[in-house]
């Protein structure tokens, strides 16, 4: 379910209340975050793309909030998850985004990936962006995986890879943080708990899958 509200301070306060203190924003400066011309969209490599609990994009410099959530959701033969959550909060010079889900069960080309909880956060303040992620109880084909917390920790799987705490910087400095990104060439590209913040705007998605 997706909810939008143009109310500014009231909605931002309500969203922070729902998060229950999970998000801790850095101090806001006085300079304006002014977006440069938008870069063009990137065409998906695979045929179909599905987004679960996606906020859409909040324009940079907008004082507003977008959120999306779901109790359970899934993509047949690919993924299931519970307690899906995504939020993007904007201020004149700051954007904060967060995405999460619980009870992840993902199967990509015969590789089974599970996690108790997956979350990412991205924050951009006056053009400088930082991101973090958290993964609890990760396993691949039933084998527990040590999550180091380092950016772009990569684990090989048949035909592809799983990247943990993936952090990508777009040409304009916008930061994209994918807590877990599973790719099998020509089969599926699945980002779990994806948060974006920067000049290109703010957005969050519990899941984005191309297959």
Segment roles from a protein language model:
Residues 25, 29-211:
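Extended, solvent-exposed, non-transmembrane regions
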Residues 1-31:
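Sec-dependent, cleavable N-terminal signal peptides
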């Amino acid at each position: 379910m997706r909810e939008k509200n143009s109310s500014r301070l009231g909605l931002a306060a309500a969203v922070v209340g729902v998060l229950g203190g999970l998000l801790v924003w850095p101090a806001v400066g006085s300079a304006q975050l002014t977006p440069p011309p938008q870069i063009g969209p990137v065409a998906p490599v695979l045929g179909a793309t599905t987004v679960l609990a996606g906020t859409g994009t909040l324009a940079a410099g907008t004082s507003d909030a977008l959120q999306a959530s779901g109790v359970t959701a899934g993509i047949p033969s690919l993924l299931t998850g519970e307690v899906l959550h995504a939020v993007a909060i904007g201020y004149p010079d700051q954007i904060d985004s967060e995405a999460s889900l619980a009870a992840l069960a993902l199967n990509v080309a015969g590789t089974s990936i599970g996690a108790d909880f997956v979350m990412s956060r991205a924050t951009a303040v006056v053009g400088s962006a930082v991101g973090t992620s958290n993964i609890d109880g990760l396993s691949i084909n039933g084998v527990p995986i040590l999550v180091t917390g380092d950016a772009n920790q990569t684990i090989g799987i048949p035909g592809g890879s799983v990247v943990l705490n993936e952090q990508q910087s777009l040409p304009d400095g916008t930061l994209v943080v994918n807590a877990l990104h599973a790719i099998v060439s020509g089969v599926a590209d699945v980002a779990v708990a994806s948060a974006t913040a920067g000049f290109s705007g703010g957005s969050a998605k519990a899941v984005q899958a191309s297959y």
